[in-house]
């Protein structure tokens, strides 16, 4: 059973830094943070609430927010798309969601977000097609 948005396990800056470090170690690239404030903002945005209620409808929308804000804020020197993708997958799995296996749809989604072709709502709609 998936948790409610209010009871989701959220990612921290430290977790996202570990995801980023793992992606750089595995696939190469330059380590380092380009802008710490943009990283903190990208990690905080999916945790937004108003009057104790999440501003997001469900876990998939929150995962899409991690993907969207980490891609668009571009907080790292290198590996922003990989870190955003990894954060999205980790969040989904930690919150009992089942992302479908790797396929070109994932790469297309991440590249479209990074290029500015999708807004957050469009990102959520596309992500829903990739999660069981």
What do the PLM-derived regions correspond to, one by one?
Residues 1-132:
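FIC/Doc superfamily catalytic core
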């Amino acid at each position: 059973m998936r948790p409610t948005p209010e009871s989701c396990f959220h990612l921290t800056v430290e977790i996202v830094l570990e995801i980023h470090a793992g992606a750089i170690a595995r696939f190469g690239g330059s380590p380092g943070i380009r802008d710490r404030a943009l990283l903190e903002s990208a990690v905080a945005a999916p945790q937004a609430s108003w009057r104790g209620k999440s501003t997001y409808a469900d876990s998939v929308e929150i995962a899409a927010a991690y993907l969207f804000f980490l891609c668009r804020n571009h907080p790292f020197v290198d590996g922003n798309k990989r870190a955003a993708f990894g954060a999205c997958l980790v969040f989904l799995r930690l919150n009992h969601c089942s992302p479908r296996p790797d396929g070109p749809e994932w790469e297309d989604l991440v590249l479209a977000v990074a290029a500015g072709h999708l807004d957050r709502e469009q990102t959520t709609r596309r992500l829903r097609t990739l999660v069981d």
